[in-house]
């Protein structure tokens, strides 16, 4: 089992790091008291091999040796990785002033600036025990996400799920599409009597469309467009990308084009799905 502990000063980006871990398949728990880590891992054994928890100043033991004992008494086979996120007092003060959130150590007689300094002092021993120290003072959320992925995966890229969806314009456009392409200008198998009752999944329709230079050129251009911009989309904290392909009825052209694109991107670099909305509705 892999366990990732994320700690750091409030406002330094712990929630961003947890979101990255969640996208990577980790079971995430926010602000779990350290004495409960062992029991949590025992309960998740066999069902979740990736676990991440965040620890802040409110759930730390008062003595450093207690923390060390808790981290060294984890269940056998636990692979531990830890992060400590920090920012300068000036940056943290600015972030809290902008969001107007209450600092965990803020009290009626303690100013925000004093609370920030106190937290830094309390967390200093913990910061010395963490595997990875990240100063987020000059990082935006995307740069921080990249650093966390780089440490865990050895790469800033994460697995992007690409969904190719065919649809018919006469049945309405899909609302969840990131890109939408209209293929109604392509040669239409509907006007071939023997092809009309078939779909873009059937071999005769596929052969008909594959013989059309315009169809092949269009597929190539969409593939080239997506290949060019996919690396940038992956670094923009995306988990899913939906490309909708539409023709008139959603039976022939859009189905074929979506299938061809799905095959071209099923090269092991991404998880690819092909969904045909109107064909699914017909089966239902």
From Swiss-Prot:
ATP binds at residues 8-15. GTP binds at residues 56-59. Keywords: ATP-binding, GTP-binding, Nucleotide-binding. It comes from the Bacteria. Pfam families: PapZ_C, RapZ-like_N. One of its GO terms (molecular function) is GTP binding. NCBIfam families: PRK05416.1. Displays ATPase and GTPase activities. Belongs to the RapZ-like family. PANTHER family: RNASE ADAPTER PROTEIN RAPZ. This is Nucleotide-binding protein Shewmr4_0670. It comes from Shewanella sp. (strain MR-4).
């Amino acid at each position: 089992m892999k366990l990732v502990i994320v700690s750091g000063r409030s406002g330094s980006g712990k929630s961003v790091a947890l979101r990255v871990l969640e996208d990577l398949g980790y079971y995430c728990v926010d602000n779990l008291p350290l004495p409960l880590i062992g029991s949590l891992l025992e309960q998740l054994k066999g069902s979740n091999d990736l676990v991440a928890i965040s620890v802040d100043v409110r759930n730390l033991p008062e003595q450093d040796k207690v923390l060390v004992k808790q981290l060294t008494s984890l269940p056998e086979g636990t692979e531990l990785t830890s992060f400590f996120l920090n920012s300068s007092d000036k940056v943290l003060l600015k972030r809290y002033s902008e969001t107007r959130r209450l600092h965990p150590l803020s009290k009626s007689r303690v100013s925000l600036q004093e609370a920030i300094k106190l937290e830094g002092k309390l967390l200093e021993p913990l910061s010395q025990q963490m595997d990875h120290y990240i100063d987020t003072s000059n990082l935006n959320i995307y740069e921080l996400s990249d650093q966390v992925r780089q440490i865990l995966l050895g790469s800033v890229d994460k697995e992007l799920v690409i969904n190719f969806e065919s649809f018919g314009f006469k049945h309405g456009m899909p609302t969840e599409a990131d890109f939408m392409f209209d293929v109604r200008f392509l040669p239409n198998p509907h006007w071939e009597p023997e092809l009309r009752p078939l779909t873009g999944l059937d071999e005769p329709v596929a052969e008909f469309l594959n013989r059309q230079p315009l169809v092949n050129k269009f597929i190539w251009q969409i593939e080239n467009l997506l290949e060019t911009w996919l690396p940038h989309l992956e670094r923009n904290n995306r988990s899913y990308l939906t490309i909708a392909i539409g023709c008139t009825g959603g039976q022939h052209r859009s189905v074929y084009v979506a299938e061809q694109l799905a095959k071209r991107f099923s090269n092991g670099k991404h998880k690819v799905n092909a969904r045909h909305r109107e064909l699914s509705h017909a089966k239902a």
